[in-house]
Structures are given as C-alpha cells and as structure tokens.
C-alpha cells in the first residue's frame, strides 16, 4: 500500500554519477573523460564555466584534431569577470585544435549539457570545471538513448542560432 510497484516506461539506461570532495576517485571527471575519449562523430558541450582538468581539455583537443565535431558553447558573459578571463585562457588552443567556440549572446547560458554521438546525453548540476569535478557536491545523469540525444541536439542547434562563433585569428 505504501510502496506501489513502479511502472516501467522505457528500456533506456540512465546512470547517475556524483562528484564531490570524497573518495579516491573523481567519478564525474572520469565518466566525462571516458565519454569524450570514446566519441566518434560529435561532442557538443554547453557550460557556463569552462575551467577543465588537463585530461579533459586534452581529450577534447585530440578529438577535434581527429576530425570529431567538437563544439563548446559558453555564455558571451558569465556572472564573473574573473571566471570569464580564466575560461578564455583555454580557448585559443581549443580553436587551434579545431574546436568550435560559440558564445551565447542573449543572456547568461547556465545549461550543463554534453552530447556524444547522438547516443549519450549528460545533464545535471556540474559545470565543466575543476570545482564541480573535485570540490563541489554535484550530480549528473548519463542518459544512453538516441531519442533523448537527438532532442537535446535540436535544443543545442536552436541555442547555436543565438551564438556568435569565435575564431582564433580574431580572438587575440
């Protein structure tokens, strides 16, 4: 009576991955790095803050150099000038590797989204920064489902229409 049977609505797989200042391993950083390293076609990211680990930053650059469509969407202006300056320090190398850098213009983009190959969607509370991976208590959902990934891809593309792409030659 108090615990009715849950109805199964889908066969899709959802994995919850936490992070925080506990334990030996940084599960969320490892899961994101593994997903990025195993991408074959597409890695699209929305994050308000981009202060990644060296491993994740390198994995994204290697993916772009290998011909994978890597897009990083950031707010044109975040809520912190210091964080903007720190985030921007990574972008020239990213662009030189072939990562498309997109600045969202209408307002402060606070979305945390990672789409891999139209098969994996990662959403949750974690930014793509070392604080979320190592210091803050965060949780992301890894959704292994093509339909969800395609829906998120359409949302990303809608947001991209509100962006300006930055190029290395006019960045400096």
Question: What are these regions, as identified by a protein language model?
Answer:
Residues 1-172:
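Charged, low-complexity intrinsically disordered terminal segments
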